[in-house]
Amino acid sequence: ETAHLIIDVQKTYLESKENQKENEEWQPFFNRMKDIVIPNIKSLISFTREKKIENIFARIACHKESGLDRSLSQKKPGFNYLLLPKDTPSGQIVDELKPDPDDIVVMKTTDSALTGTNLRLILRNMGIKNVVCTGIFTDQCVSSTVRSLVDESFNVIVIEDCCAAATDELHKHELEIINMIYCHVVNLEEAK
């Protein structure tokens, strides 16, 4: 009845930025990912596999090399602009969390892992009622996915120390917004 959904933990988000100033601005995010989020998600994946709980991965990827099939938010200039053709190395899940051959991986071109994918149908077909969400970015794809799941009558848990946003402030603020309205926010220790 429960599945673990890992959202957008892709190589592109851990790559160095083009200039030093941008790298410095993103360093707290990189540190949180390396020191907390990725190790915690890895631990949770091991735990869920032991308990025979499904791990499902969502990743941003477009089918066409040109990106023609991307959503408007990914085509517009700015922070969300993203061109990640499905076979691009930087668009793959990070090596530390590499899906097993039998794990489901959905590709999306929207913030929500439900919009524009068959994830909703997959969850229903598998008899899933509860979804544990982890990944990035808390204030974008994680939040959008949580809201979509709740709208589709799934029970949702977000694991705080298995998620990250561009800044800790954004991360904490978004968790305050979605907690108890759309989901229950817990830490990894509480979830196990």
Q: Where would I find each of the regions flagged by the language model?
A:
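Short glycine-rich, polar/acidic loop-and-turn segments at beta strand-coil junctions
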Residues: 11, 33, 59-62
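Short acidic, Gly/Ser-rich segments with clustered Asp/Glu that frequently serve as metal-coordination loops
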Residues: 10-16
